[in-house]
Amino acid sequence: MNFFQAIFLGLVQALTEYLPVSSSAHIRIIGDLMLGSDPGAAFTAIIQIGTELAVILYFRHDIIRILGAWFGSLFGKEGKDFKSRMGAHNRDTQMGWFIIIGTLPILIAGLLFKDAIESTLRNLWITVTVLIIFGILLWVVDARAKQVKTMDEMTWKDALIFGIGQMLALIPGVSRSGGTITFGRAMGYTREAAVRVSFLMAIPAVFGAGILEAVSAVKDVAAGNAGMFPGWGATIAATIVAFVVGYVVIIGFLKFVSTFSYKAFAIYRIALAVVVALLLICGVLHPTEVVAAA
């Protein structure tokens, strides 16, 4: 992978990360078409840090408020009882705990099934299958679910269900936002509330994965096993592109969901799956990673 190819993949990451279409699937598919090989889980995870930095910038006021309330409940002089520490009297404190709860499923699954996530689950036939399944689920759930619940009505149970939706995004094709939004809409959350929860809940998970993969990439490069990794210069540049373009996409996506349904995204997922299946059948794409020179 050369510098410009890495930059292009950073752009793809930014355009697809927040939409319920699976950025990891797009990176996997376009990487195969462009490079003849999977760009790899390490490169994908690291450039996702760029899009999450855009989320932090956009939601900075919410994040500062939530962190302030959460740390205040733990170390502040007031509210020493257990219920206060858990956010019984402060929604921001509670949201901090909800984000932690929602992060646990993907953290546990990511550690337990790391090898499968980085190999078996990146098979493009699996990607095709889940693109279709979650496309249909998103379409049906969004069309039939009520829009009554806001973020202020979230419960511990809801946070865990959101987290399970995020956990499923470890499979390329599910989509982190697609999983959480689908589960959120199924619980009756408004489209905008489901999106906001999806954005906030992804921050610790994506940063954690990015840092772990960065450490792993450093070890691989030092050992001479870089594979398709384009080098740190290209990877950092791709991450910056993902950050800048990603910020613009966040603004547009939030405006979109306040007016329109997710039907267009569901149709796109299904159409993409059909195209990828045809390319696999014709031998243009490879279902599993092909060893190629960096």
Curated annotation (Swiss-Prot):
Chief place where the protein resides: membrane
Membrane topology recorded in Swiss-Prot or TrEMBL: Multi-pass membrane protein
Enzyme Commission identifier(s): 3.6.1.27
Annotated localization: Cell membrane
A GO-annotated cellular component: plasma membrane
Keyword match Cell membrane: yes
NCBIfam families: PRK00281.2-1, undec_PP_bacA
Family: Belongs to the UppP family.
Function noted in UniProt: Catalyzes the dephosphorylation of undecaprenyl diphosphate (UPP). Confers resistance to bacitracin.
Note: Bacitracin is thought to be involved in the inhibition of peptidoglycan synthesis by sequestering undecaprenyl diphosphate, thereby reducing the pool of lipid carrier available.
Name used for this protein in its record: Undecaprenyl-diphosphatase
Originating species: Bifidobacterium adolescentis (strain ATCC 15703 / DSM 20083 / NCTC 11814 / E194a)
